[in-house]
Amino acid sequence: MSIHLRRLSTLFFVAFLWIGNLPAQDIGWQIGFHGFADNREYAKSGLYSQSILGMRIAPELIFSMDSAHFLHGGVNFLHEFGSVAAKDVVPTVYYNYRQQGHDFYIGMFPRKDLLAGYHRAILNDTLNYYRPNIEGLLWRYGNKIFRQQVWIDWTSRQTETEREQFMVGLSGRVNSGSLYLAHQITLWHDAGKKNNTDENETPVRDNGAAMLKIGIDLSELSFLDSLDISGGGIVSYDRLRSIYDWRTPKGVITDIYAEYRKIFIANTFYAGEGLDIAYGDRFYTSGLYDRLEIGWKPLQYKGLESQFTLSFHFTRGAVDNQQQFTLRYNIGKLYVTQR
């Protein structure tokens, strides 16, 4: 057993002893399965073509004193098809507070559902395969009209051999009838190694993006199950200290999503300057880009979600394609004790 897993086992053991001495608490469990097959044919655009196939399974135990305070402990296990052994096992341990519209997390907690609303231009979808957890804090507040969230994800702790890296984000939305105003902001900080004196070391980098969009949700006014149209502006910002100052390319971006009886069509169009966003989709480095998606959701039932998507990527002088199938299955139960 690795040192990392031994430490994790010790942490769970101490937590169980502590919980056992508490007054009556609710105990539960949940298991999340994520299977994915993503074939990317990007050669015509000069980007990296690859096939990503694998699965993740994430069992968790849940302890709760009441309806507001929750402690989760588990692991997230990745296996890529064709590999000899597991590529990655990461701990999932976090505290969650939920009450009166507030939702607070601290620890190592799943990014699914929390950052899923971020645009691919800012946070690419490959993160769902290889970085399932946020390591840090997240707070959000929401009601029918207003929602806002702020978070920090510590991606690398500074040591003698590793650089210090973290990302902070802010996002929100305000609704007024069918209209809405939404924003998304990120900043990634990449600093040097501890006690480093190497003159060839990459300088400190600050990189991020901000997007502001206005949209209209016409789902209730049409025969479709879902119809959403939005558009606005996006700017990226990047600097490499002592090398170059802030660079701020910008452009306009529009999104259309329509769904009817498990069949959907989505289109994203970007025009402007090439965006250099560290965690963003690399297609947006092109000054002109259009993404057309045609998809089908064959299985949708009680925690089971599946989706097949055929995507076409249009850049200047090139058309690439992508086929993606994902399946998520989440089950669980909380056993409530009488107090």
Where are these regions (language model features)?
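Subset of outer-membrane beta-barrel
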Residues: 62-68, 76, 87-103, 109-112, ...
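Flexible, solvent-exposed loop segments that connect beta-strands
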Residues: 43-47, 120-122, 196-199
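Surface-exposed coil loops of outer-membrane beta-barrel proteins
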Residues: 103-173, 184
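Beta-barrel outer-membrane channel/assembly domains of diderm bacteria
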Residues: 24-98, 323-331, 338
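Bacterial Sec-dependent N-terminal signal peptides
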Residues: 1-30, 139, 321-339
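Exposed, low-structure sequence patches enriched in small/polar residues
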Residues: 54, 92, 143-161, 167-339
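Short acidic/His/Gly/Ser-rich catalytic and metal-binding motifs that mark active-site loops
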Residues: 38-40, 113-117, 191-193
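Short, glycine/acidic-rich beta->alpha junctions
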Residues: 53, 85-87, 131, 164, ...
